[in-house]
Amino acid sequence: EATANADCFVEVSGILNAAAINLIKVSDDLRRLAMLGEIKLPAVQAGSSIMPGKVNPVILESVIQVGIKVKANNTIVADCAARGSLQICEFMPLLADALLESIDLLIAASGMLSAHAEKIEVNRDRCLERLAASPEIITAFIPRLGYDRCTELVKKYEQQNEQTVREFLENELGKETVEKTLSPQNLMSLGHRKEN
């Protein structure tokens, strides 16, 4: 069993693959938030040669590339394990190399991303501006009003051009209801709560 099957390494590689996928997702999300101006990434090198002042997301792009490499290594580990012959896995050297490389890369990328993330600044004004202009905030009213009523509100809001979403909702539902529903405590709470 010890020389015939390498499935324990495939399992470990699968866990590393899942970690890589999460690092890719987080890094992509941070890149998008930076592009939208909702966060400011720390500069780590000279910016764009054609756009003065631009901060390139090089750390995030580096972490994404590590994730892609770890995913590729996962395929190598699986293929090497599958190609063992009877009682021996002849491809163990390549399997081990890919697995150990993935571990080293993930340790380095996780540390790099963690240190980088601590220096990210939130552009609060931009976030609030985008939130105020987004009819998607009507989603927060689904537990109170139901999906169909919220869909009607979105359609009605989109037919007018004079008011912000919040002003529109206050006219439709009342200021107290809007303030309570859109309060940070309510928005950040888990699940839906029934009102007494």
Where are these regions (language model features)?
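Conserved, well-structured ligand/cofactor-binding cores
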Residues: 1-196
